[in-house]
């Protein structure tokens, strides 16, 4: 087994540092301007240099043409060549008899190379080249003579040198100006980013969620608006969290206080020398304690479900809503076997949170059963309304919900005056709303019998999905044994209608009729 190296030989992690965005923008501007300056300088230098050399070539050709066309080379070649000494060129005339006439500028000598010798020998008719800082033109004449003319490139080199100096200075100034301008632009452009940074640090340090002022409509302004949207969402989330904690504390305080009072009374009655409570009162206290514990358990469970949905991370899967309704009905019947359930469901698939959908349906059925009088009827319908939507309707024959309170029943911990005398946490319908909206659905509340006495309440839940057809793609049929033993399954999820559910000798009995 290979042992790890001793600690002294372990290499410490290298600290990687990066330039700030402002410096990167400034360096990018400098680099781009420098590249453009270099390219432009090279182009200008090449164009000017080519123009100067072309001008020298044109001057040499013009001087040679003038000497040849004037006839002075044939009449008096010596005088013609000497006349060039007063200009800025060097000249040489080589006759066939090898007589040579020359005229050079002071300190200059017309160089002879292989190209000029080839022209003199007649192998070449024309030669133009650069040698010894001179531009040399050699022309073979028709009479066998050869004319050589050269011009110094020193003045041209001086001009090009000054041009290079000017281009270097101008380019350097341009790069410096680009750096300064880039820094100013980066500073001005990144000012909103600085405000965002300060705001983020302020939020982390002080929990101050005030929005940032937005200026303009550019990308940084949109970034600021997005950050403000995040701040607003965070503010709403914290407000909901604070409201949930406050409401939960308020709702928990009442049963806890009552539970504490009853427990203290029971403990005091068991103390040595304390008067004994009648057995009936003891039984009542114990029943109250159990009821309060159940109420606390229900409240805590609802809170867990509520926070679970908000926290996210739930697993989405294909859910058979007919199966969900059947399982929820099975649980509700155990608690209320003195009411009838009128059920009519179709096979419908929803892609979503199976546990959340089951809890929402169970809460709707529990709410309907709670408000239904003994012998009442609860209607449960799941019907397809269009190719991609189905509607679940849960109706009861209870006292109904006033129209002014229908928006409030879905608020957390809201309980009407009539509901406060009944068990419940005030979170059931809030969970229903949260689950339905999370699945892209909609819900509303109406009277079961408008104008009736009592009017009853009907909850309408619209859920997106697809129909579940026997033998088609979708979830496999669930065996009928998993449901109410008295319920019979037809096909994958055939429509069924429960006619009556009555209590006989403490046991529930149901009769079903398949449609």
Curated annotation (Swiss-Prot):
The record's account of how the chain is modified after translation: Autophosphorylated.
Compartment(s) where it occurs, according to its Swiss-Prot or TrEMBL record: Cell membrane
A single cellular component GO annotation: plasma membrane
Keyword tags: ATP-binding, Cell membrane, Hydrolase, Kinase, Magnesium, Manganese, Membrane, Nucleotide-binding, Phosphoprotein, Protein phosphatase, Stress response, Transferase, Transmembrane, Transmembrane helix, Two-component regulatory system, Virulence
Domain Histidine kinase: 247-467
Extracellular domain ranges by topology: 46-165
The EC number(s) this enzyme carries: 2.7.13.3, 3.1.3.-
Protein name per Swiss-Prot or TrEMBL: Signal transduction histidine-protein kinase/phosphatase MprB
Organism: Mycobacterium sp. (strain KMS)
The keyword RNA-binding appears for this protein: no
Gene symbol of the encoding locus: mprB
Catalysed transformations (reactions): ATP + protein L-histidine = ADP + protein N-phospho-L-histidine
Job of this protein: Member of the two-component regulatory system MprB/MprA which contributes to maintaining a balance among several systems involved in stress resistance and is required for establishment and maintenance of persistent infection in the host. In response to environmental signals MprB acts both as a membrane-associated protein kinase that undergoes autophosphorylation and subsequently transfers the phosphate to MprA, and a protein phosphatase that dephosphorylates phospho-MprA.
HAMP domain segment(s): 187-239
């Amino acid at each position: 087994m290979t042992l790890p190296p001793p600690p002294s030989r372990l290499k410490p992690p290298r600290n990687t540092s990066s330039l700030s965005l402002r410096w990167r923008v400034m360096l990018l501007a400098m680099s781009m301007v420098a590249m453009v300056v270099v390219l432009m300088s090279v182009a200008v230098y090449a164009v000017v240099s080519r123009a100067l050399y072309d001008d020298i070539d044109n001057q040499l050709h013009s001087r040679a043409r003038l000497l040849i066309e004037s006839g002075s080379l044939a009449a008096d070649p010596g005088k013609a060549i000497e006349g060039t000494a007063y200009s800025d060129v060097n000249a040489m005339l080589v006759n066939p008899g090898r007589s040579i006439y020359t005229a050079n500028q002071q300190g200059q000598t017309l160089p002879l190379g292989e190209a000029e010798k080839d022209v003199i020998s007649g192998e070449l008719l024309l030669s133009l080249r650069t040698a010894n800082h001179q531009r040399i033109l050699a022309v073979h004449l028709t009479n066998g003579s050869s004319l050589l003319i050269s011009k110094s490139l020193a003045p041209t080199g001086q001009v090009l040198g000054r041009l290079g100096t000017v281009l270097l200075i101008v380019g350097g100034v341009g790069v410096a100006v680009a750096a300064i301008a880039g820094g100013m632009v980066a500073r001005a452009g990144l000012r909103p980013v600085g405000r965002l940074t300060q705001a983020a640090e302020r939020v982390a340090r002080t929990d101050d969620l005030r929005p940032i002022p937005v200026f303009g409509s550019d990308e940084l302004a949109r970034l600021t608006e997005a950050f403000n949207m995040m701040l607003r969402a965070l503010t709403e989330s914290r407000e909901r969290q604070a409201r949930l904690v406050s409401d939960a504390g308020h709702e928990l305080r009442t049963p806890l206080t009552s539970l504490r009072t009853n427990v203290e009374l029971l403990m005091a009655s068991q103390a040595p020398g304390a008067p004994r409570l009648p057995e009936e009162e003891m039984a009542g206290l114990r029943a109250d304690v159990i009821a309060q514990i159940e109420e606390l358990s229900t409240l805590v469970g609802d809170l867990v479900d509520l926070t679970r949905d908000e926290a996210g991370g739930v697993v989405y899967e294909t859910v058979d809503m007919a199966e969900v309704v059947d399982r929820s009905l099975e649980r509700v019947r155990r608690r209320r076997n003195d009411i009838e359930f009128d059920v009519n469901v179709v096979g419908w698939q929803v892609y979503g949170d199976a546990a959340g959908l089951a809890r929402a349906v169970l809460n709707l059925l529990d709410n309907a059963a709670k408000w239904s009088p003994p012998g009442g009827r609860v209607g449960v319908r799941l019907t397809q309304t269009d190719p991609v939507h189905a509607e679940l309707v849960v109706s009861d024959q209870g006292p109904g919900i006033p129209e002014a309170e229908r928006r409030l029943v879905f608020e957390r911990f809201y309980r009407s005056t009539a509901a406060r005398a009944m068990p419940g946490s005030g979170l059931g319908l809030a969970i229903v709303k949260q689950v339905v909206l999370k699945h892209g659905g909609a819900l509303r509340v109406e009277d079961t019998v408008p104008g009736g006495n009592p009017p009853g309440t009907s909850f309408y839940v619209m859920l997106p999905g697809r129909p579940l057809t026997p033998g088609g793609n979708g979830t496999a049929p669930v065996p009928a044994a998993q449901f109410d033993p008295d319920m019979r399954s037809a096909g994958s999820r055939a429509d069924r209608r429960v006619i009556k559910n009555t209590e006989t000798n403490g046991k529930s009995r149901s009769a079903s009729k398949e449609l």
